[in-house]
Every structure is written in structure tokens, then in C-alpha cells.
Amino acid sequence: MKLNPFALTLAPLLAAGAFSAHAGPQAHVVCAYHHTLGDDAIMMFGKPNQAMWHDFFGNTHTDAVSTYQTLRDQPETTCDNKADSSAYWAPSLRLPDGTVVKPAYQKTYYQASNVDAWPLHPFPAGLSLLAGDHHGSAPNPHITFLCANGKGYTTKTGEVCGLRKANDAVQFNIGIQFPNCWDGVNLKPAHGLINATYDVKGQCPSTFPVKIPTVNMNIAYVLPTISSLDTSKVQLSMDPIMHGDEREERWGSLYTAHADFMNGWTEDAARFMTDLCMNRGLDCGTTVPYGYSRAKANVWLSSLEPDLSQPEPQVLLVQDNWQNGGRTKNSETLSLVKFHIPPLPAGQDPSQFTYRVRIYGGKVETNGADQIFFYPASNDWD
């Protein structure tokens, strides 16, 4: 069996799982709703309570002065992967009867296409993205709506949602697809300046050459107090008219849907997501680690040739033949791998993290099953 490469990862316990090679290049997180503020640290930095009402997910400290550094300095998150302290936010939603409701959670898929031809780059520290149009008045191909009892996502409003399958609530989702081609210069958009755009069949334009994972955010509203919802009459918060410190609220149709993303992934996690997961066509699910290190040395040894060692970077051979005489008649090949051990996160409960060895590779033979065993060993070799 050939394996390529080896990595030692520091993973939150909630991120246990195995890679899938069948769902395409992606990873995901689920983040519960946490708080609502009239803040926007991307477009109205340093101006608390002057933006539209926003519902915040992920980092629990997000406010009008949040930056990548504050997200990492205060990494507490509602997301199910502690490597992700990103801030996600979207405008508050008002029902036709005037009731402002809170979302239940948001699930974000990080996805990509055509990575063989145009591979991904990791999110840079400090990157912020916008998606949607807060002045929108018509369907947007990057904004979709879903009734959980309906026929799937649509870009148009007007569907009337009924009770979902469990018959316990109306569930209404808003999907927001963020741009995935960064200009490589501006970490934040600004009024009159976009810092990212969308690819075309996986390829980024020359003016926005840096391809990053597509952030597909899906916000779920679970509404147990109603039995139907006319989406043409649902509204979203818009920027208020300010009279000194007093707010005059404004509301717009669902076509004003938009969202903000401020990257708060650890740098190791962002790099792992692209380099060792999505660029290899893998579905990492929630197993993107908090930190990781590649093998810094490796060698394989044969029992029939004890004086022969074969260092071969990036490729390790593991072999143990039990057929035709078993171990006494067949060579055994042992691989030794040396790692730098990623440190535990400062200030966080160490019991919430565990170390794992991750491998990527496959069988050389077409038949039979394989088992791989890992044991600690001395590190006085090179």
C-alpha cells in the first residue's frame, strides 16, 4: 500500500470523521445563531448601531470593530469546528405580521470546481467578503430561497411555505453564494470597491486571479408558531435613517438578501482545507483540523534487508504479507515517520482536542483488505 502524504493534525473532538472522496471538493461547518446588533465591521467599521440589524453566527464577540486579530484573540464560536472562529452575518428577517424572528443556525459549505486545472489558494488572514445586493429588487443568481416542504431552492420569491416533513414548524432557508476570485490585494471591500468576483467554470478572471474556496452560506429559519409563510411578503432589515443616535428603521423585500463573511479560520486550517483537502478532490466534512504538520522525515525498512533503508519523500510503502508462509517467509516493510507536534491552543480546554495521524493514498493491489497500525517510536533517527 502506498500512502501520500502523512500529516499529524490537532483536531477538535467535534470534528471527528473520515475523508470522503466521492462528494467533491468541499468542507462544511454548522454555526448556531448567537446575537443581533446594528453593526457591520466590514462596511461600517467603528460605527456601532448605525447599520441595519444583523444576525450573527460563529464568533461570539463579533461587533462593529471586529478584525481578523480580534476574532483569533477571542476565538469562542458557535460553529461545530473550533478551528473556525469566522464571523458570519446577514440582515434580520421580519414576517408578514411584523414579527422579527431569529434564525436557528447557518450551515456553510466551502466548495470548488475544476481544481485540477485551477487549484485553490487558502483564505488569507483578514479576508472579508460580501455577497448579494442590499438594494436588490430582482432575482440574483447567487441568492436562493427554500421552503423545506417545497421543490428546492429558487431565485424567486412568492412561494408559500407550509409545514416541513416533521409537521412541527415552517422552515425557510436563504442561500448566499460568496464570490471566490480575490483580487490578491484588498482584504476588505469598500463602498465603490469590490475585492472579489465569481469564477467562470472554475477559472478566475485576470483582474481577480486568486481562486479561493466558494463560501456557500445557508441560513435556516425554523418557525414553529406559524403554519404557512408567503415569501413575497417577508422582509429583511435595511440600513436605518439616523436622527442623531435615534434609528428610523427601514425594511426591504427578500431580493435585498445579502451576507458578510470575515475569515477567522486558523491559518493552518485554511491551508489544510485547500492544499490537503479540496485541491485533492476530497470532502473533508467537519474534519478540517485546528493545526497540522506534515511529516518532516520518513523512511521505510525491510525485514529481509535490515541494512537497507529507502527514504522517499511523500511516498511511504507499508507491507505485511501473511500469505504463503506468512511473516516468516515474506518481507515486512515498516515505515517510520517523524512529525513536529502542533501545540494545543492557548486558553482553550485541552480535553476538547485530540491528535490524529492522517494519511492519503490507496492500495497497490486490486484485491484484499488492508489494516494500518500506528505505534509511538523513538525519534533518534533521520
Where are the language model's segments positioned?
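Short, solvent-exposed beta-strand/turn "edge" segments of beta-rich domains on protein surfaces
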Residues: N167-A169, T207-F208, R327-S331, P345-P350
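Gram-negative bacterial Sec-dependent N-terminal signal peptides
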Residues: M1-H22
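Structural recognition of the beta-strand scaffold that forms the well-ordered cores
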Residues: H54-F57, N180, K338, V357, ...
